[in-house]
Amino acid sequence: MKHINNIKRKGDLAEYYAVTWLWDNGYEVFQNSGCTGPIDMIAMKEGQATLIDVKTMTKDKDSPNYRGKISRTEAQKQLGVKFLLFNPETRKLRWSRHGK
């Protein structure tokens, strides 16, 4: 994988992969026009709306594995935002398992 240094570019890449992954999984996707706020996109499937924040997973310096270790903000928790985690090495996505 080509290394991407620009953090904004990393986020853009993750979001583009997220959109196509969501399409492949039967969702309609509506993206945020700005780069700030508690959500990146809204995905609709079977009449249900899912508020999504896409996060690029990072490697721990002590481990070769990627992980998503970012917590939702209070606003995201109140809105019911779900994290969709992007692995930049494999280009795969998965839903985060959120606690309460």
Feature locations, PLM:
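Short connector loops at helix/strand junctions that flank enzyme active sites
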Residues: T36-P38, G47-L51, Q78-G80
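Domain-level recognition of nuclease-like catalytic cores that cleave nucleotide substrates
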Residues: K69-I70, A75-K100
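Short beta-strand-loop-alpha-helix junction that forms the active-site gateway
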Residues: K8, V54-Y66
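Acidic-basic catalytic patches of nuclease active cores, encompassing PD-(D/E)XK
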Residues: M1-N32
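Conserved catalytic cores of phosphodiester-cleaving nucleases, focusing on short active-site segments
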Residues: A18, L22, M41-A43, G47-T58
